[in-house]
Amino acid sequence: MAYGWWRRRRRRWRRWRRRPWRRRWRTRRRRPARRRGRRRNVRRRRRGGRWRRRYRRWKRKGRRRKKAKIIIRQWQPNYRRRCNIVGYIPVLICGENTVSRNYATHSDDTNYPGPLGGGMTTDKFTLRILYDEYKRFMNYWTASNEDLDLCRYLGVNMYFFRHPDVDFIIKINTMPPFLDTELTAPSIHPGMLALDKRARWIPSLKSRPGKKHYIKIRVGAPKMFTDKWYPQTDLCDMVLLTVYATAADMQYPFGSPLTDSVVVNFQVLQSMYDQNISILPDQKSEREKLLTQITDYIPFYNTTQTIAQLKPFIDAGNITPNTPATTWGSYINTTKFTTAATTTYTYPGTTTTTVTMLTCNDSWYRGTVYNDKIKNLPKQAATLYSKATKTLLGNTFTTDDHTLEYHGGLYSSIWLSPGRSYFETTGAYTDIKYNPFTDRGEGNMLWIDWLSKKNMNYDKVQSKCLISDLPLWAAAYGYVEFCAKSTGDQNIHMNARLLIRSPFTDPQLLVHTDPTKGFVPYSLNFGNGKMPGGSSNVPIRMRAKWYPTLFHQQEVLEALAQSGPFAYHSDIKKVSLGMKYRFKWIWGGNPVRQQVVRNPCKETHSSGNRVPRSLQIVDPKYNSPELTFHTWDFRRGLFGPKAIQRMQQQPTTTDIFSAGHKRPRRDTEVYHSSQEGEQKESLLFPPVKLLRRVPPWEDSQQEESGSQSSEEETQTVSQQLKQQLQQQRILGVKLRLLFNQVQKIQQNQDINPTLLPRGGDLASLFQIAP
């Protein structure tokens, strides 16, 4: 019998280390020597080993000092209840070719068909948002907050679930202020976030197999937050934390394997559009002059888009029979290549630049495919289609401008399509090539202009949302959503255009004699007369207003964003990052005990109902101490008159169902300077501007007596009274808010102003500069 085999089995090799309880020798007991000074010997004995002598320093006896700090204690409410808010949400959902968008802004969109979401997100969490998720059946509360008007916040545990194929990078911020700036979205780009030491990688199961399928992160309370009891109404809108997340590609960080180059190509408008870019009606005459110059330049017609836009107009019989050219064949150049004659054309937008072309119809040797009769077709087609659009739409459509029409206007695909019969004979555009790994960011500028602006130069007042000195691949990340939040225009993708200035492109998007000059890029689909995504179904209203906007420039930003390092290349139709959260709260208060009396004669069953017991959750916005009964309100079996009067002021709930919030609540707010806020509010409330500029302790009549006297003469007495009434009402609202804040400070219920939402602190209330 091989019983000894078990003893002979080789043990697993381990690194040798000394056990803490074993010593090579032990301290030896010896006679204590006389010492002078402030040290004395200490004799200790250990088990086993040799003896060894040990010493310790003599502790100097000093005078007793007072305590540097004291502990301030707060009385807790009589009733306390722990509550965990547990739920599941998608941190981000990224559809195909939506990498550069912000999912937090598009989370509540209902567009279909088409991709949804974005490749990055800036989510915030508040108690109101958690209650809103509860109303959407996205989380559950382990305890009810009914009649408990106080609360404490203890932190949150987050669990991020790894995707099978796509990697993610997240960053959790608990440092106020929780506001977006022009640098927030570029810093969330995977190429930038990969360099952040506080970022956490969420690798896919494919990139890092064999590990847990989730990553747990423990997050405490926000910085500068004092842990004490607060009314739920005060913590309702306080931002607890923000989550920045983005999709990334760890397997192919420097370009997709489905492409043969990392260079990005797009087109920009030529300089002929510089002074004719506005869409205002008073600039129509200038646009007509430019359109005439473009239509007279016959080499621009050397493209297949000429057939797509103008041939249906001829085939439909829109040309009068008396004209000699009634068929499409009459507009084609029939001159053979053997002819050595040439024709000189003046390039549009200039008076001195000329281009010499052969008269033959061979476009590969700089010939023209069409003859001079085609010059009038674009204007005739644009005029007819523009009038037809106005007739169909009726009073809802007031624009009748053939220069902006889809088929033959200034931005028709005949002039802007990159597909030419010969690649060296371009249209009214310039091909731009961009290598993301040569971009240092120095001198780059990215901004938007309203469609009414009359030039392409950057202006500090008219231009908005400037991002400078950053690589284009980072500046393009989440840019459109930042512009929408910064300007407050949710339809900005149809009301503004994008301009770029960069010395790191080929050719350079830079004019050395005019440093503020920008260039208008557009996507390949817009140049071909298609919608974003490649659809040929252009709406009839958009065909009458066909010009480059952010809606048609989004694909350029998408290509720039995907060219950066570690960027997700949108290889899957839809990806999502799931998260589970567990927010820890404590509800407290002094509620009136509610005694439930049941019918003793009714038959009851020992077993409970099959339906899970539901909790009564109250909106934290209305769960305030003023609207809650407390134990001190109940005297001798009755409620006091003050308590009844206070409860009668509670607002009643209505059954009107709204269409939803204009912007998702989880989306973070944007930072506005005090100067921008004053400019916006001065447009909405002109009388309030006088209240903020002139302090109440100064005499404004002496300083502005001359300017105000002329205004008072023109205004009637009723108008002056209305303005004064409006000023008094606004001032009254601010004073009431001021007294409310002072009362909270006296009650030790104040919150750090940096944690409050925008407009909730005294500095923003009275425009005090930080």
Curated annotation (Swiss-Prot):
GO cellular component: T=1 icosahedral viral capsid
Biased composition (Basic and acidic residues): 666-681
InterPro entries: TTvirus_Unk
Disordered: region residues: 647-682, 697-717
Compositional bias ranges of the Low complexity kind: 703-717
Domain of life: Viruses
The UniProt record lists the keyword Transferase: no
Example GO biological process: DNA replication
UniProt keyword Lipid metabolism present: no
Function text: May self assemble to form an icosahedral capsid. Presumably essential to initiate and monitor viral genome replication by a rolling circle mechanism.
Family: Belongs to the anelloviridae capsid protein family.
Protein name as it appears in the record: Probable capsid and replication-associated protein
Source organism: Torque teno virus (strain VT416)
